[in-house]
Amino acid sequence: MNIETLFPLDPNVKVRTRFAPSPTGYLHVGGARTALYSWLYAKHFNGEFVLRIEDTDLERSTPEATAAILEGMEWLNLAWEHGPYYQTKRFDRYNQVIDQMIEQGLAYRCYCSKERLENLRHEQEANKEKPRYDRHCLAHHDQPTDAPHVVRFKNPQEGSVVFDDAVRGRIEISNSELDDLIIRRTDGSPTYNFCVVVDDWDMGITHVVRGEDHINNTPRQINILKALGAPIPTYAHVSMINGDDGQKLSKRHGAVSVMQYRDDGYLPEALINYLVRLGWGHGDQEIFSREEMIELFDIHSVSKSASAFNTDKLQWLNQHYMRSLPAEHVAKYLAWHMNDQAIDTSNGPALEEIIPVLSERAKTLKELAAASRYFYQEFDGYDEKAAAKNFKAEAVAPLAKLLEKLTALTDWSVEAIHDAMNATAADLEIGMGKVGMPFRLAVTGSGQSPSMDITAKLVGRERTLARIQKAIEFIQAQA
């Protein structure tokens, strides 16, 4: 039987991996980690990474889910050399191989009704036997080929399937445990396990990294590959990801969709760094650049044990990258959140200017965007608790004096604003807090902000002066 390549298989490429999600939902963090491990392993060996969309489940697969998967992969910057390929566009190829297998005696048509199969299963269970097909149709060829039927793979009945899993070590399954797998349904559509095999063969996949839930599929797929005379990839089955409570990660633990993490304000660098450490590590190192991941990652070093997702750790990493990545880079992602929160940044400081100022306090870009609103927009009122403490009648004098000094400035710089604050405190013989706290509340509407000299510089001269005047009038009106 002949291979049908989808792209030139470069003989110099020693490692070719694939990520093959089913478009029945969003790209979740477990799938993203699998994609990352596959991508890193290929890059480590200067190999190739293939993206394949396994959309044979026609009832559950949707274009929206496909788009969400592609969007998630692009956001994570996991670029593929080949693809995306869609299984639904390759049905002719799968059926061609199935027909050849029937001709060569590697597969056979099965005409058994649902009733017969149900009766067979009940009989085997009553005899405490493992339910399996009895190969009734292998010995009976008296049915016309156009009668309703499925096609079954003729699985070996003797021996075992043995493979060395890159994560779990040697795995052996007796062929007596395996049934004659249906590879084509009554409606003529090929089944998942068969499509996967043909795809891996045609795409020259050398290493299959996937979740541990696929372990039971592997011996079936290996037997089909052997029947086709195709090379057997190296398999690596990674463990599941649990929540903080040890239960399987789910929606009740918070975000599980990759794009939900985007929406919640995480940088792709932070999520990638966090995911790579969920089951793999290099000593005590926590922070990895993408280049370091490629250099150091080894699928054989991935843990067999389930990993626990820790949101606090992810937030710590996110804050690290918000502070350490170039502000110009972070600004590209922050802009999305500013737009999402309806903050018009056209009249205010550049995003690159506010990022280093606000990233010390914010854990996510979503928080940073919300905290930056006063740089670009007017606010309706003041924080009640802060106003009760800092907008008493005696705050009018320092605000008025500061307004006078700031108005006189010809240089609207951090240093000049800082000097004006000091001079106000000195002139009135009061502590800096008596100047700074009312000033902060007047300009930001909040009792918390970065240093006020920097804040006022970024808010701008006109806005700052107008807000101080407005605060004075507010306090006087309350008196």
UniProtKB/Swiss-Prot annotation:
Q: EC no.?
A: 6.1.1.17
For this protein, the record's PROSITE patterns field holds: AA_TRNA_LIGASE_I
Instruction: List the subcellular locations.
Output: Cytoplasm
GO MF entry, a single one: glutamate-tRNA ligase activity
Give start-end ranges for motif 'HIGH' region: 21-31
Q: Motif 'KMSKS' region — list its residue ranges.
A: 248-252
Q: Report the catalytic activity.
A: tRNA(Glu) + L-glutamate + ATP = L-glutamyl-tRNA(Glu) + AMP + diphosphate
One cellular component term from this protein's GO annotations in UniProt: cytosol
Pfam families recorded: Anticodon_2 (PF19269), tRNA-synt_1c (PF00749)
Q: What does this protein do?
A: Catalyzes the attachment of glutamate to tRNA(Glu) in a two-step reaction: glutamate is first activated by ATP to form Glu-AMP and then transferred to the acceptor end of tRNA(Glu).
What does the subunit section of this Swiss-Prot or TrEMBL entry state?
Monomer.
Q: Which family does it belong to?
A: Belongs to the class-I aminoacyl-tRNA synthetase family. Glutamate--tRNA ligase type 1 subfamily.
* Name under which the protein is recorded: Glutamate--tRNA ligase
What organism is this sequence from?
A: Actinobacillus pleuropneumoniae serotype 3 (strain JL03)
